[in-house]
Amino acid sequence: MTQIDYTRAAKYFLLQDVWQGFKLGLKYFFAPKATINYPHEKGPLSPRFRGEHALRRYPNGEERCIACKLCEAVCPAQAITIDAEPREDGSRRTTRYDIDMTKCIYCGFCQEACPVDAIVEGPNFEFATETREELFYDKDKLLANGERWEAEIARNLELDAPYR
């Protein structure tokens, strides 16, 4: 006939598995919470975080973009459109710099390709809009983002410099 497995029967009648589960539940119930209350508390961001795009200026106020169009060429989503014209001194500057944020995949290739760190992806990730048209960034919007986030962008680029 069949022998009775006493250890298995003891586990069954003493509800050992249930008590183990209860013990584990109590352990995590009293452990410190890992959840943050997002709108009121924000977690740390990496210096390499890729958020909302921005165009930067030099400290004297001149735009950094030299209209080389490398960012436009390297963009896999074809989200960047640039028009440029030559200036009196022989250099080029952009007349139009548009980014279609509905196409952008935030890969960071534009930032990597830029020889003068003109286009960067800043620390802002809270840029929800009510209309699709607000996601078409023109040069003025990008420059305004750059002015708004310049201190943090410069600090992040400095922290990331050893890895570039």
UniProtKB/Swiss-Prot annotation:
<dbReference type="GO" id="GO:0048038">
    <property type="term" value="F:quinone binding"/>
</dbReference>
<keyword id="KW-0472">Membrane</keyword>
<dbReference type="Pfam" id="PF12838">
    <property type="entry name" value="Fer4_7"/>
</dbReference>
<keyword id="KW-1278">Translocase</keyword>
<keyword id="KW-0411">Iron-sulfur</keyword>
<feature type="binding site">
    <location>
        <position position="75"/>
    </location>
    <ligand>
        <name>[4Fe-4S] cluster 2</name>
    </ligand>
</feature>
<feature type="binding site">
    <location>
        <position position="114"/>
    </location>
    <ligand>
        <name>[4Fe-4S] cluster 1</name>
    </ligand>
</feature>
<keyword id="KW-0479">Metal-binding</keyword>
<feature type="domain" description="4Fe-4S ferredoxin-type 2">
    <location>
        <begin position="95"/>
        <end position="124"/>
    </location>
</feature>
<keyword id="KW-0830">Ubiquinone</keyword>
<comment type="function">
    <text>NDH-1 shuttles electrons from NADH, via FMN and iron-sulfur (Fe-S) centers, to quinones in the respiratory chain. The immediate electron acceptor for the enzyme in this species is believed to be ubiquinone. Couples the redox reaction to proton translocation (for every two electrons transferred, four hydrogen ions are translocated across the cytoplasmic membrane), and thus conserves the redox energy in a proton gradient.</text>
</comment>
<feature type="binding site">
    <location>
        <position position="71"/>
    </location>
    <ligand>
        <name>[4Fe-4S] cluster 1</name>
    </ligand>
</feature>
<feature type="binding site">
    <location>
        <position position="110"/>
    </location>
    <ligand>
        <name>[4Fe-4S] cluster 2</name>
    </ligand>
</feature>
<feature type="domain" description="4Fe-4S ferredoxin-type 1">
    <location>
        <begin position="55"/>
        <end position="85"/>
    </location>
</feature>
<feature type="binding site">
    <location>
        <position position="65"/>
    </location>
    <ligand>
        <name>[4Fe-4S] cluster 1</name>
    </ligand>
</feature>
<comment type="subunit">
    <text>NDH-1 is composed of 14 different subunits. Subunits NuoA, H, J, K, L, M, N constitute the membrane sector of the complex.</text>
</comment>
<keyword id="KW-0677">Repeat</keyword>
<dbReference type="GO" id="GO:0005886">
    <property type="term" value="C:plasma membrane"/>
</dbReference>
<keyword id="KW-0874">Quinone</keyword>
<feature type="binding site">
    <location>
        <position position="68"/>
    </location>
    <ligand>
        <name>[4Fe-4S] cluster 1</name>
    </ligand>
</feature>
<keyword id="KW-0004">4Fe-4S</keyword>
<feature type="binding site">
    <location>
        <position position="107"/>
    </location>
    <ligand>
        <name>[4Fe-4S] cluster 2</name>
    </ligand>
</feature>
<dbReference type="GO" id="GO:0009060">
    <property type="term" value="P:aerobic respiration"/>
</dbReference>
<keyword id="KW-1003">Cell membrane</keyword>
<keyword id="KW-0997">Cell inner membrane</keyword>
<protein>
    <recommendedName>
        <fullName>NADH-quinone oxidoreductase subunit I</fullName>
        <ecNumber>7.1.1.-</ecNumber>
    </recommendedName>
</protein>
<keyword id="KW-0408">Iron</keyword>
<comment type="similarity">
    <text>Belongs to the complex I 23 kDa subunit family.</text>
</comment>
<dbReference type="GO" id="GO:0051539">
    <property type="term" value="F:4 iron, 4 sulfur cluster binding"/>
</dbReference>
<feature type="binding site">
    <location>
        <position position="104"/>
    </location>
    <ligand>
        <name>[4Fe-4S] cluster 2</name>
    </ligand>
</feature>
<dbReference type="InterPro" id="IPR017896">
    <property type="entry name" value="4Fe4S_Fe-S-bd"/>
</dbReference>
<dbReference type="GO" id="GO:0050136">
    <property type="term" value="F:NADH:ubiquinone reductase (non-electrogenic) activity"/>
</dbReference>
<dbReference type="InterPro" id="IPR017900">
    <property type="entry name" value="4Fe4S_Fe_S_CS"/>
</dbReference>
<dbReference type="InterPro" id="IPR010226">
    <property type="entry name" value="NADH_quinone_OxRdtase_chainI"/>
</dbReference>
<keyword id="KW-0520">NAD</keyword>
<dbReference type="GO" id="GO:0005506">
    <property type="term" value="F:iron ion binding"/>
</dbReference>
